[in-house]
C-alpha cells in the first residue's frame, strides 16, 4: 500500500497506544504537523514554546508510563526542546521525539560527499543536525536518510524508549521525505534481539531467598523505594510486598508519591534536603533494600563515606553502572528489573507472617515522624507581613483529596514541596529532580493534567521559575485545563539568595531580584488578569488558608499568589557546620541544619556519632 510517510508515522504512534502529542508547528515539520494534527486517534496540544512541549511530554509520561509524542521543527524548534529532553534522560522518562529537518539534499550531511572531507556547518535554511546534539541525552537518535527505513527506525526507537532503563528517543525526518510516499508492504522491520541481549536476566530464586533472609535477621532494616518502581510497572507489586516485609519505607524526591504519609510503614524522605526521620532511618539502618533508586548524590550527600555507614546495602537496579558509583557502597548489587524483582519477592514472602519482626524499630521510626515533623509549630505562627512557605505547602496538600494531581516546579516549590507535601492515598506528584530546571511547573502541570484525564491539577510555581515559561498560561486557557496555579512569591531567585547569603556575606547581592537592583519581576496580579485568570493573593497564613480553600472550590483554572518570607531558609537540610574553633566540617546526613544539640542527636542514634573533627 502506498502511503505518505508522515501518515505512516501518525498511524504507527496511534497503533502503539499514543493518544496525545505536544507540539509547536513549523515549516520544517509541515507534513508531520498535518498528519498528526488530523489523525482521528491523536490529540495535539499546541504550546507556545518547544521547551514547554518537551516538559509537558515528560510530565505526561510520569503519570502512567504512557508516552505522549513530541513534534518539533528544524533548527530552533529542536534546540528549544533540549532542556525538556535532557530532563527526561536524567530522570529515565520515556519520550518519543519527532523533528522536522530541511530537504535531505540541502543538509550538510548530504553535502559532505562534495567537500573533500572538510566540515560544513549547514546548507539548508534553518538547518541544524540536531541528532549530534541529542545523542548524549537519548537512547537512540537518528536522521532518516532513506525513507524505506522508516519502519525500522520507528520500531527501534519505540522499543528502546520503553525497554530496560527508559529514556528519550529522537527521529529527525527531512521535509521532502515527510511528504513523500512509501510502499508500506515492503518496509524492513527491526529485530530487538541484539539490543535485548543487554537487558538483565530474570531474577533467580537464590537472590530472592538471600534478600528475605537478610531482612529476617536484620534489626533495623529499611526499604529505600525509588521511582524506578513505577517506571518498571512494579507499583502494585511494591505495595503488596511492602506489607509482607513490614519494614520502614523511605523515599526521595521523584518517588515521594509511592506511599501516602499516613501509611504506618512510611518513615520519611532521606537525602540532603529530606527530613530528619527519613535520614535517621537510613543512617541508623543495619540493612537497606534499595529498589529502583539510583541513590543520587542528593541522597548520600557530599560526605558520602558516612552515608548508611552501618548498613549492608542490597541495591536492585536495571543499570549496572549506577551500582558501581564511587559515592556508594553496595554489598549486594542485584542487576534486575524492579518489577521482576518485586513480583518474585512478593511470591516468595509468606502471605500472613511479616518477614521482619523488628517491630520496635518500626515504632521508633513512627515516633520520629511524630516528634520531628517536617512543618514546625513556629511555621504556623504569623509574622505580620507574609505567609510561611512550609505552612502553605502543608495546608494546601492536606486539603487535597485522594488521587489528586500535582506538578511542582523548582526552587522553593520542589525543596519545600518534597519536604512538607502531604501525600494522600493514590496522589501523584510530578517533579524533575535531576536537571531541576526553572520553568518546569506550568508545562509539567499541562502534561500532568492531560495525562490524568483533565482532572483538577495543582501547579506549584515560583516567581522566578514561572518567567521561564510564562507563555504557557495561555495554553492552559486555550485548552480549558482545570489547573490551579499557586505562585510562591519570594521576591526573586530565593535558592540563589540563600547561597549568596551563605558564601558571599561581604558582597552585595547580584542577579537575584529587586534587592540586587539588577533583576525585576512584573506584578503578577496584572499578568494573571491580562491572561484572564481569576486572581487572589495572601500575605499571611490566615489569608493563605482562605485563598487556598477558595481556589480549590472554584471551577476551572485559578491563579493564587502566596507572598513568603525572603529570610526563609530550607530546613532541615544538609549544611556545613562551623565548630567552636572555627573549623568547617560537612556533617553526615543524620546531623541536619538547624543543628540539634549533640545530646539530643545522640539519643536518636543506634550507632556511634561521627566525631566532629
PLM features: residue spans?
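Phosphate/pyrophosphate-binding active-site segments
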Residues: 1, 145-148, 213, 311-410, ...
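N-terminal alpha/beta PP-like core and its mobile active-site loop of ThDP/TPP-dependent enzymes
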Residues: 1-356, 399, 482-485, 505-506, ...
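Active-site diphosphate/adenylate-binding microenvironment
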Residues: 6-9, 14-19, 27, 32-36, ...
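N-terminal cationic-hydrophobic initiation segments that often serve targeting/anchoring roles
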Residues: 61, 161, 242, 397, ...
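Conserved short loop/turn motifs at secondary-structure junctions
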Residues: 226-231, 381-382, 462
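Hydrophobic, well-ordered secondary-structure segments
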Residues: 299-303, 310, 345-353, 360-372, ...
Amino acid at each position: 500500500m502506498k502511503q505518505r510517510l508522515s501518515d505512516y508515522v501518525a498511524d504507527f504512534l496511534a497503533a502503539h497506544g499514543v493518544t496525545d502529542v505536544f507540539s509547536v508547528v513549523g515549516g520544517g515539520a509541515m507534513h508531520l504537523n498535518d498528519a498528526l494534527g488530523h489523525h482521528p486517534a491523536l490529540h495535539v496540544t499546541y504550546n507556545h514554546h518547544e521547551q514547554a512541549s518537551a516538559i509537558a511530554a515528560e510530565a505526561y509520561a510520569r503519570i502512567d508510563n504512557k508516552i505522549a509524542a513530541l513534534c518539533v521543527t528544524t533548527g530552533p524548534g529542536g534546540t528549544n526542546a533540549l532542556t525538556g529532553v535532557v530532563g527526561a534522560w536524567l530522570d529515565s522518562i520515556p519520550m518519543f521525539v519527532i523533528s522536522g529537518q530541511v530537504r535531505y539534499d540541502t543538509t550538510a550531511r548530504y553535502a559532505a560527499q562534495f567537500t573533500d572531507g572538510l566540515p560544513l556547518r549547514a546548507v539548508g535554511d534553518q538547518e541544524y543536525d540536531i541528532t549530534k546534539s541529542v545523542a548524549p541525552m537519548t537512547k537512540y537518535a537518528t536522521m532518516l536518510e532513506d525513507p524505506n527505513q522508516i519502519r525500522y527506525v520507528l520500531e527501534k526507537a519505540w522499543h528502546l524508549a520503553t525497554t530496560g532503563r527508559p529514556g528519550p528517543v529522537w527521529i529527525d525526518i527531512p521535509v521532502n521525505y515527510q511528504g513523500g510516499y512509501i510502499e508500506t508492504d515492503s518496509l524492513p522491520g527491526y529485530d530487538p534481539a541484539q539490543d535485548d541481549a543487554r537487558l538483565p536476566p530474570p531474577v533467580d530464586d537464590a537472590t530472592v531467598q538471600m534478600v528475605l533472609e537478610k531482612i529476617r535477621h536484620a534489626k533495623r532494616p529499611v526499604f529505600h523505594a525509588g521511582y524506578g518502581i513505577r517506571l518498571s510497572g512494579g507499583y502494585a507489586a511494591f505495595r503488596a510486598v511492602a506489607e509482607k516485609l513490614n519494614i520502614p519505607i523511605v523515599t526521595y524526591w521523584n518517588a515521594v508519591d509511592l506511599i501516602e504519609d499516613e501509611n504506618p510503614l512510611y518513615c520519611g524522605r532521606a537525602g540532603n534536603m529530606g527530613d530528619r526521620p527519613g535520614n535517621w532511618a537510613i543512617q541508623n539502618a543495619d540493612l537497606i533494600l534499595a529498589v529502583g533508586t539510583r541513590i543520587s548524590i542528593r541522597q548520600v550527600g557530599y560526605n558520602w563515606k558516612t552515608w548508611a555507614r552501618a548498613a549492608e546495602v542490597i541495591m536492585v537496579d536495571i543499570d549496572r553502572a549506577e551500582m558501581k558509583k564511587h559515592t556508594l557502597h553496595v554489598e549486594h548489587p542485584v542487576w534486575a528489573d524492579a518489577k521482576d524483582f518485586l513480583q518474585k519477592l512478593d511470591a516468595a514472602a509468606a502471605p500472613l507472617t511479616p518477614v521482619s519482626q523488628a517491630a520496635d524499630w518500626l515504632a521508633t521510626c513512627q515516633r520520629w515522624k511524630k516528634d520531628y515533623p517536617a512543618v514546625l509549630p513556629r511555621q504556623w505562627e504569623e509574622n505580620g507581613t507574609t505567609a510561611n512557605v512550609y505552612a502553605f505547602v502543608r495546608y494546601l496538600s492536606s486539603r487535597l483529596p485522594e488521587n489528586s494531581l500535582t506538578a511542582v516546579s523548582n526552587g522553593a516549590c520542589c525543596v519545600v514541596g518534597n519536604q512538607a507535601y502531604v501525600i494522600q492515598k493514590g496522589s501523584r506528584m510530578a517533579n524533575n529532580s535531576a536537571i531541576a530546571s526553572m520553568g518546569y511547573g506550568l508545562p509539567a502541570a499541562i502534561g500532568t493534567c492531560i495525562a490524568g484525564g483533565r482532572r483538577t491539577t495543582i501547579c506549584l510555581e515560583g516567581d522566578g521559575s514561572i518567567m521561564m515559561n510564562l507563555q504557557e498560561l495561555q495554553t492552559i486557557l486555550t485548552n480549558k485545563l482545570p489547573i490551579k496555579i499557586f505562585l510562591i512569591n519570594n521576591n526573586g531567585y530565593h535558592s540563589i539568595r540563600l547561597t549568596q547569603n551563605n558564601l558571599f556575606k561581604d558582597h552585595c547581592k547580584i542577579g537575584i531580584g529587586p534587592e540586587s537592583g539588577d533583576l525585576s519581576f512584573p506584578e503578577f496580579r496584572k499578568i494573571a488578569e491580562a491572561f484572564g485568570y481569576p486572581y487572589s493573593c495572601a500575605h499571611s497564613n490566615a489569608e493563605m488558608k482562605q485563598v487556598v480553600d477558595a481556589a480549590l472550590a472554584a471551577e476551572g483554572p485559578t491563579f493564587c499568589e502566596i507572598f513568603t518570607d525572603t529570610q526563609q531558609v530550607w530546613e532541615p537540610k544538609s549544611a556545613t557546620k562551623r565548630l567552636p574553633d572555627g573549623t568547617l566540617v560537612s556533617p553526615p546526613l543524620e546531623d541536619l541544619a538547624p543543628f540539634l544539640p549533640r545530646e539530643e542527636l545522640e539519643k536518636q542514634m543506634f550507632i556511634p556519632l561521627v566525631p566532629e573533627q
